[in-house]
Curated annotation (Swiss-Prot):
Record note on quaternary structure: Interacts with Sir2 and probably also with Ku; may form a trimeric complex during NHEJ. Interacts with Mycobacterium phage Omega and Corndog Ku homologs (AC Q853W0, AC Q856K7).
Chain positions covered by the region annotation Disordered: 735-762
Protein's name according to its UniProt entry: Multifunctional non-homologous end joining protein LigD
Source organism phylogeny: Bacteria, Bacillati, Actinomycetota, Actinomycetes, Mycobacteriales
Cofactor binding, per record: Binds 4 Mn(2+); 2 Mn(2+) for polymerase/primase activity, 1 each for 3-phosphoesterase and ligase.
The organism of origin for this protein: Mycolicibacterium smegmatis (strain ATCC 700084 / mc(2)155)
Gene: ligD
Residues the entry annotates as binding Mn(2+) 2: 136, 138, 226
Pfam families in alphabetical order: DNA_ligase_A_C, DNA_ligase_A_M, LigD_N, LigD_Prim-Pol
Consequence of substituting residue 138 to A: Loss of templated and non-templated DNA synthesis, but not ligase activity
EC number: 6.5.1.1
Miscellaneous: LigD has variable architecture; domain order can be permutated, domains can be independently encoded, while some bacteria lack the 3'-phosphoesterase domain entirely.
Similarity comment: family membership: In the N-terminal section; belongs to the LigD polymerase family. In the central section; belongs to the LigD 3'-phosphoesterase family.
Entries under CDD domains matching the protein: Adenylation_DNA_ligase_LigD_LigC, MtLigD_Pol_like, OBF_DNA_ligase_LigD
Length: 762
């Protein structure tokens, strides 16, 4: 049987006490057996109680003693339990909401044998509509199980006439329960009215066997078809709940074939568990729209978004690139470090008391904790006293990682499990190396620094990327300042006279730059890998993106190097930027390699300098930063004079006047979580040659379907020819409007060095 997502929750925060206490004397059933039953049945039970206020009926001393109902959640209840409040005439009652296996474990620990819920769920903290109808078939004195089943089939027939499905249960007490899922939720009052009419209709059709009246004196020899439990204020024993009877019976889902069996009887908890492998959840369609637990369910249950600055997203996490990590210094009750690795839309998290080991000679404890949201990659702040994890948290390091092995058992904290293993190579500013996390037992893992594998091959290097920001507050003591050159980013691998040039995406582009052949001779005594920019210069010697787009043979194109990644068999990725810069300048001294001068002064002076020189902007680099291939790092900050944005072409409009035979404007978008977002049109900045070239390139990409995630505004949709979103360009613009459009965009050119999936808002 496939496991339901609810079954993946952990329960290490619930400690079972008095496991040997006998709760069912007639069978000797202990509290430990009850606890194990609820843990085992949670995968199918939780969807039918999720989102609903839970009333518990407790037998702390067993079913031979008195029981009591408990609605109000005690102040001592754990903070991670989800809550919901209902205001009654007598006041407000706060109920537990059991959305997880762990929550059901808490119910069992309290000896709450019976779980009762209404037929509605909370919605945004308030009482929502009924999602299902329930009929309780309560037998009067002398009524047999066969007669109950006869009435159940009659109810089913009436529901079928209404195009509604009906699901039967033996209640575990005396009667039967029938559940009817509602395709469209209705008010509890509406559900009660419908159920009452069905009951009254059967009472009229079968007056000797059915009554819809609550008066007990009228029930002898009849089945009371109880419709009243659909009232918003009433509850019903939950499917799969134990019953507080002499024997540990269960409100057990049954098949309709069983309801026709004259030998039908109530089932014990062990029998219900045995049936799971054969039948699965017979009620699965009943609550198919239940709020599905995801990997952040436990995380959310431990935090109140109104009380903590931590991110508490409501959305189900979406899978990302599985390549980011963060280490946070957490000044909680005890100082420790939290390692978080992006995986399948969440951050798999470990508390590491002494941080990751620095050498291969030592191992350190790492305690697995609940998955955290992706937003936690950037979280820092103070968690208030009284909240989970209270204390100050700062980002100690962050970066990217590569995976060799990532095995985290589904039952992460099973005390008998020791099969988890993670091997990753971390690329951060402080941590850079190969690490293993090995599960020793349950939630305890071991963190080990491994020997690094052979250095990455030069042909595998990807460019390090800068983060958008302002350099105004940066000082020259900590930061170096370079010009941001208006060209194409390239990686050059010069190996003793052999030259290879790759674009930012790794595409081989050696043939596109015949002007760089001389570098092979200039660097013939070395094997060197350089990072830099291919630039086309205008008449005044300033890099021009327009010239780069439309370069002719006579266009002056140069390679401007600004970093060195490899030299004669040695990787320089871990060297400080200051040391790499010295090596680069020494390599260029007296040769043909161009290394542009750094900019003078602090951040403001550097920006003023590039304004006067008409450069694109400034890139600030920390003197002590390492080179982090393929990662957008906060160690490099780019600050542009002009607003520029990479865009994806999603269509074009016919021109007018002199452009009537070609393109008048391009229709632009930026990829996002929901698809390609329309950001406007651009109709200026083109040369006639560019427009002709664009038309030829877009013609084979024609499509009848819009590539955008929403219909275009009417004024923009008129006369549009849609194309497949495969070409990337760049525009300059004045500002971004509140609805996500680019104001006054001007075309700068195509970006053949970029792919659509690389385009994001800058």
């Amino acid at each position: 049987m496939a496991r339901h997502p609810w079954g993946m929750e952990r329960y290490e925060r619930v400690r079972l006490t008095n496991p040997d206490k006998v709760l069912y004397p007639a069978t000797g059933t202990t509290k430990a057996e009850v606890f194990d039953y609820y843990l085992s049945i949670a995968q199918v039970m939780v969807p039918h109680i999720a989102g609903r206020p839970v009333t518990r009926k407790r037998w702390p001393n067993g079913v031979a003693e008195e029981a009591f109902f408990e609605k109000q959640l005690a102040s001592s209840a754990p903070s991670w339990l989800e809550r919901g409040s209902i205001t009654h005439k007598s006041g407000t009652t706060t109920y537990p909401i059991i959305n997880t296996r762990e929550g059901l474990a808490w119910v069992a620990q309290q000896a709450s044998l019976e779980v009762h819920v209404p037929q509605w769920r909370f919605e945004d903290g308030d009482q929502g509509p009924a999602t299902r109808i329930v009929f309780d078939l309560d037998p009067g004195e002398g009524v047999t199980m066969t007669q109950l089943c006869e009435i159940a089939h009659e109810v089913r027939a009436l529901m079928t006439d209404l195009d509604l499905e009906t699901y039967p249960l033996t209640s575990g007490s005396k009667g039967l329960h029938l559940y009817v899922p509602l395709a469209e939720p209705i008010s509890s009052r509406g559900a009660s009215v419908l159920a009452r009419r069905v009951a009254q209709q059967l009472e009229q059709a079968m007056p000797k066997l059915v009554t819809a009246t609550m008066t007990k004196s009228l029930r002898a020899g009849k089945v009371f078809l109880d419709w009243s439990q659909n009232n918003a204020a009433k509850t019903t024993i939950a499917p799969y709940s134990l019953r507080g009877r002499d024997h540990p019976t269960v409100a057990a889902p049954r098949t309709w074939d069983e309801i026709a069996d004259p030998e039908l009887r109530h089932l014990r908890f062990d029998e219900v568990l045995d049936r799971l492998d054969e039948y699965g959840d017979l009620l699965a369609p009943l609550d198919a729209d239940a709020p599905i637990a995801d990997k952040l369910t436990t995380y959310r249950s431990m935090r109140d978004a109104s009380k903590t600055p931590e991110p508490v997203p409501k959305e189900i996490p979406k899978t990302g690139n599985n390549d980011k990590f963060v280490i946070q210094e957490h000044h909680a009750r005890r100082l420790h470090y939290d390692l978080r690795l992006e995986r399948d839309g969440v951050l798999v998290s470990f508390a590491v008391p002494k941080n990751l080991p620095e050498t291969t000679a030592e191992n350190r404890l790492a305690v697995h904790t609940e998955d955290h949201p992706i937003e936690y990659l950037a979280f820092h702040g103070s968690i208030p006293k009284g909240e989970y994890g209270a204390g100050d948290m700062v980002i100690w390091d962050s970066g990217s990682y590569e995976t060799e092995k990532f095995r985290v058992p589904e039952e992460l904290d099973n005390p008998d499990d020791s099969h988890g293993e993670i091997i990753v190579t971390l690329h951060g500013e402080k941590v850079d190396g190969r690490y293993a996390l090995i599960q020793t037992k349950g939630k305890n893992w071991l963190a080990h620094r491994m020997k690094d594998q052979k250095n990455a091959r030069p042909e595998d290097f990807a460019p390090m990327l800068a983060t958008e920001g302002s350099v105004a507050k940066y000082k020259a003591k900590q930061w170096a300042f370079e010009g941001k050159w208006d060209g194409y980013r390239v990686i050059i691998d010069a190996d003793h006279g052999q030259l290879q040039i790759r674009s930012r995406t790794g595409r081989e582009v050696t043939g596109e730059y015949p002007q760089f052949k001389a570098l092979a001779a200039d660097l013939a005594e070395h094997h060197v890998v350089l990072d830099g920019e291919a630039v086309a210069l205008d008449e005044s010697g300033v890099p021009s993106f327009g010239q780069m787009q439309n370069r002719a043979r006579s266009t002056r194109v140069e390679f401007w190097a600004f970093d060195i990644l490899w030299l004669d068999g040695r990787s320089l990725l871990r060297a400080k930027y200051s040391d790499r810069r010295k090596i680069l300048e020494a390599l260029a001294d007296g040769g043909g390699l161009i290394v542009p001068d750094q900019l003078p002064g602090d951040g403001p002076e550097a920006m003023e300098h590039v304004r006067k020189k008409r450069f694109e902007g400034v890139v600030a680099k920390k003197w002590d930063s390492t080179y982090q291939p393929g990662r957008r790092s906060s160690s490099w900050i780019k600050d542009k004079i002009w607003n520029t944005q990479e865009v994806v072409i999603g269509g074009w409009r016919q021109g007018e006047g002199g452009r009537s035979s070609g393109i008048g404007a391009l229709v632009l978008g930026i990829p996002g979580p929901e698809g390609l977002q329309f950001v406007g049109r651009v109709g200026t900045g083109f040369t006639e040659k560019e427009l002709s070239k664009l038309k030829d390139m877009l013609k084979p990409l024609h499509t009848d379907e819009s590539p955008f995630n929403a219909p275009l505004p009417k004024v923009d949709a008129r006369g549009v020819t849609f194309v497949r979103p495969e070409l990337v360009g760049e525009v300059r613009y004045s500002e971004r409007t509140s609805d996500g459009r680019l104001r006054q965009p001007s075309w700068r050119g195509l970006r053949p060095d970029k792919t659509p999936d690389e385009v994001v808002w800058e």
